[in-house]
Amino acid sequence: MRFSLSTTGLQDWNGDVLVVGLLQDQPATDLEARFPGLGAALAQQQFKGKPSEQLLINRLGNNGPQRLVVLGLGPANAFNLDGVRSAAARAAKAASGHTGSLGLQLSWDGLEPTAAAAAAAEAARLALYADQRFRKAPEPRRQPEALELIGLPATAAAGLQTVDATCAGVELARELVAAPPNVVTPAALAETAAELARNHGLELTVLERADCEARGMGAFLCVSQGSDLDPKLIHLIYRPDGEVKRRVALVGKGLTFDSGGYNLKVGAAQIDMMKFDMGGSAAVLGAMRSIAERKPAGVEVHMIVASCENMINGSAVHPGDIVTAADGTTIEINNTDAEGRLTLADALLYASEQKPDAVVDLATLTGACVIALGDEMAGLWSNNDGLATALQQAADAGGEGLWRMPLRASYKEGLKSKLADFKNTGPRPGGSITAALFLEHFVGDGIAWAHIDIAGTVWSDKGRGLDPAGATGYGVRTLANWICNPE
């Protein structure tokens, strides 16, 4: 899909599908002037401009668009960038079946034009995403080839420049999360990183099992013991032209399948969906795709993924085993289904060795976070208020729900082991907090760190807004915004 600002106004636009948004109780004066009789049609349908309302009219004559769609936008005082995204996603879906141009006019007043243009274009493209890779005969899809935004000033065009890069990263993350575990393996994630390196001039190092053993990564490696697939620690680097003013590390959980190990997932644990336990790695790989295309100046980005499967065989780690992380910390495993934090422990230690100013990890880590925040908000824990604020702003700008959670030090008592330095899980209450506290231990001194738990947001069963049902690609927009727009 191509994106542009329309050079004509509503009265003169003559593309294929025209979508116009009306605020609640807003008179349809401009529409009535262009399409006489439309006001009566809206009145007949008792159209009030509520967010759920939509009126579609086909065949408006020889001189008009083939389809007109009027969307309700809700109250004026509640219409914001999230409203733009929702309306643009609805507009794109309403234009399905037409391969020409889609014109979109919303209520842009009070919105920053550049941000509004970016929000609308990203939502329109992402809402039409469909994954048909695994079908014998993919269904033909007719979609608009171009989106023209009507009524925005010329300065808004700057917001369209990064849309393709952002959406490409989100779509890569969606593809990785949605693919089955016999397709997306640790080796496949490493190959995805290799392809990014080849296509975008990035640097890649992949540590094999022997390399990880030499580094003493016992926490990571113990998780992989039950699998026939070799683990991979993937290190992808973006280096900017010119001076490096800051260095950051993105760490993603990369469990390509999680059976739970001997603490086998049963019942509501949805073992059949545990292909998405590598959602953190998908997010950071997708972010690297976007970052590599946008080429931010002055920032060096290290992406680290410790990838493996958590399976069961005669060599699998037992409940009660004690393992040693790369820094010598000993961990008593009281739950083999709390494996993600073990892989992240060694990944965070490795990330800290790169001497970053900040480390951000993303992981489908705890069901407790889903209970607390649902499936539209990810949880954020951080040891640094400035970093937490920057990530919150980046998430807000990208339309991704993020909520800061407490990092209460006293809860760390629940991780104490009688035999080792730590247990890998604490008591049930506050489980997402103790998980974050466990990770914090493995971050180097003086490094700003944040942990984002995406267990609820990585997948949408029914779809919502610009996210179709399935993998959402959550986290890519937040990370890309944080790194590329540091101000």
Curated annotation (Swiss-Prot):
S-S bridge residues: none
One Pfam family in the UniProt entry: Peptidase_M17
Top-level lineage group: Bacteria
Catalytic reaction equation(s): Release of an N-terminal amino acid, Xaa-|-Yaa-, in which Xaa is preferably Leu, but may be other amino acids including Pro although not Arg or Lys, and Yaa may be Pro. Amino acid amides and methyl esters are also readily hydrolyzed, but rates on arylamides are exceedingly low; Release of an N-terminal amino acid, preferentially leucine, but not glutamic or aspartic acids
Residues engaged in binding Mn(2+) 2: K253, D258, D277, E339
EC number: 3.4.11.1, 3.4.11.10
Keywords (A to Z) from UniProt: Aminopeptidase, Cytoplasm, Hydrolase, Manganese, Metal-binding, Protease
Residues of the signal peptide: none
RNA-binding is among the record's keywords: no
Cofactor: Mn(2+)
Sites where the protein binds Mn(2+) 1: D258, D337, E339
Keyword Transcription regulation attributed: no
GO biological process, one term: proteolysis
Active site: K265, R341
Cofactor note: Binds 2 manganese ions per subunit.
CDD domains: Peptidase_M17
Molecular function terms from GO: manganese ion binding; metalloaminopeptidase activity
Main location: cytoplasm
This protein's GO CC annotations: cytoplasm
Enzyme class: hydrolase
Location in the cell: Cytoplasm
Function: Presumably involved in the processing and regular turnover of intracellular proteins. Catalyzes the removal of unsubstituted N-terminal amino acids from various peptides.
Protein name per UniProt: Probable cytosol aminopeptidase
Organism: Parasynechococcus marenigrum (strain WH8102)
Taxonomic path: Bacteria, Bacillati, Cyanobacteriota, Cyanophyceae, Synechococcales
Gene name for this UniProt entry: pepA
